[in-house]
A protein has these predicted regions:
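Non-heme Fe(II)/2-oxoglutarate
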Residues: 1-69, 75
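Catalytic core of non-heme Fe(II) oxygenases with the double-stranded beta-helix
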Residues: 68-166
Length: 166
């Protein structure tokens, strides 16, 4: 199933238990300005950092390592909102990882915006993420993604991996 990411550039999954572990409502994300939304290790509470590390390892062991045995975790980010830069089709391949998960802590609706869309050679797909949605995304040429503008709370974490596939 995870290898499907190499066909369309994404795989949609659902992991509601991550919300129970993270308890995101207990934390404030400091960085929330356009183009400065990413909150990394030094920007978040120690307990939230530990929880995100656990989830990163969990996702690696459950989804990535069985398909890519030489893979490694790189880093994670967490943010609220959508940067204008991310509203257009793009890849993140300059960031140095091969695949990544997007995990959604909040529910979006068509009328509130905040969708996620994927594009590959001969198709496109768009989703309104709900709390607990998890998307595995290919970070290589030929696959693009974009986020829809929104003014609602839209907290998302990215868990990034190198597959080290030959």
């Amino acid at each position: 199933m995870i290898k499907d990411v190499e066909t369309k550039g994404y795989v949609k999954l659902y992991e509601p238990g991550i919300n129970d572990l993270i308890e995101i409502d207990d934390y404030t994300l400091l960085n929330n300005e356009d183009r400065l939304r990413d909150n990394s290790r030094t920007d978040v509470n120690t307990f939230l950092r530990q929880k995100l590390d656990v989830v990163h390892t969990f996702l690696h062991q459950k989804y990535i390592k069985p398909t890519y045995p030489n893979s490694e975790c790189t880093y994670w980010n967490i943010w609220d909102g959508v940067d204008r830069d991310n509203e257009g089709w793009h890849t993140d391949f300059m960031e140095g990882y091969d695949v990544f998960f997007l995990y959604y802590f909040d529910t979006t609706k068509e009328e509130t915006g905040g969708h996620i869309a994927f594009k590959w050679e001969d198709g496109e797909a768009q989703f309104q993420p709900v709390k607990g949605d998890l998307f595995l995304v290919a970070n290589k040429r030929g696959f693009w993604h974009k986020a829809g503008a929104t003014d609602i709370q839209r907290r998302v974490a990215s868990f990034n991996f190198k597959t080290n596939a030959i």
